[in-house]
Regions:
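N-terminal amphipathic/basic-hydrophobic helices that include classical n-h-c signal peptides
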Residues: 1-15
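Short acidic N-proximal helix/loop "leader" segments that mark the beginning
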Residues: 13-59
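A short beta-loop-alpha structural element at the N-terminal edge
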Residues: 62-78
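A conserved beta-strand-loop-helix scaffold within acyl/acetyltransferase catalytic domains
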Residues: 80-137, 143-145
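Conserved acetyl-CoA-binding loop-helix of GNAT-fold acetyltransferases
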Residues: 150-165
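Conserved beta-strand-loop-alpha-helix junction that forms the acyl-donor binding cleft
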Residues: 173-188
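Conserved catalytic-core motifs of GNAT/GCN5-like acyltransferases
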Residues: 176-177, 192-211
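Short, cationic low-complexity segments
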Residues: 222-254
Length: 260
């Protein structure tokens, strides 16, 4: 059933519609829903912003790394969703989980989440996300590279660690990998310490940890970027544009073949 006849357009815009009952909610019913929504949303800590930076890639292209906003989540979801069916290098599970995490952020069903994006001439090149567990501990969620062969994922992961340690001021970050490449990139390259007594949120896998000490030892090798980003360059990172899907899939296949 649709909205009842005789209801003004202005009322339709203001009121919530109960499709099961075939009627608009009363003001009292809407008030109860608002109260329930407030109860369902997790409490949030104040989070310091991540200052945008630019990174010159091996190709000579310049990637802007900046925080994404909740208003950009729908765009990110449209780009991520097709990759959930790509059974290569764990793109399927990483994309599916990242999709759910970003949707939960948009719907206020996750505590203290953030998302950083890498953008080249407006086109999305990669995404990383995570959250604050508490003021001293961070949780790394996912790193998804849409442009392979230029260490986009490695640069974005390093930016994520920079955010946790330097801007959120945390003592350590809990990390797991879902692919052998991820294990090599994070656990070995930094290197990370074992903290297997901590079950990670991603399926309860044993956690590895990046401490402040390890981060600052690795920073000169692994953390890149220049600040501030020129206003014109930063402006070109918005709105986020979708990469060509066919080109992206071919590139992913080619880089995997080169590693085999």
């Amino acid at each position: 059933p649709g909205p009842r006849s005789g209801v003004r357009a202005s009322a339709m815009k203001r009121s919530l519609y109960d499709w099961d009952e075939g009627a608009y909610l009363t003001q009292e019913e809407e008030r109860v829903i608002d109260e329930l929504e407030a109860m369902l949303r997790p409490p949030a800590l104040t989070m310091a912003p991540y200052p945008a930076k630019s990174i010159v890639l091996a190709s000579g292209e310049v990637m802007v790394v900046r925080e994404a906003t909740i208003d950009e989540v729908d765009t990110l979801l449209k780009i991520i969703q097709p990759l959930a069916w790509l059974d290569r290098d764990y793109y399927d599970i990483v994309s599916a989980r990242l999709f759910a995490e970003l949707l939960a952020w948009k719907k206020y069903r996750v505590r203290n989440e953030y998302c950083l994006v890498g953008v080249i001439d407006g086109v999305l090149a990669g995404i990383v996300n995570g959250r604050m567990f508490d003021e001293g501990h961070g949780v790394s969620y996912h790193t998804l590279s849409l442009k392979r062969g230029l260490r986009v994922g490695a640069h974005l992961f390093a930016s994520k660690m920079e955010h946790h340690i330097e801007y959120l001021g945390q003592d350590e970050v809990w990390i797991v990998a879902e692919s052998p490449i991820g294990h090599r990139r994070w656990m070995i390259e930094y290197p990370l310490d074992k903290k297997f007594e901590v079950q990670h949120e991603l399926g309860g896998a044993p956690s590895w940890v990046l401490s402040r000490e390890t981060y600052f030892k690795a920073k000169s090798r692994l953390v890149s970027g220049t600040r501030p980003v020129p206003a014109e360059l930063l402006a070109r990172s918005k709105p986020i544009l979708e990469p060509d899907l066919s080109t992206m899939l071919v590139q992913i296949e080619d880089t995997l073949e080169a590693r085999l």
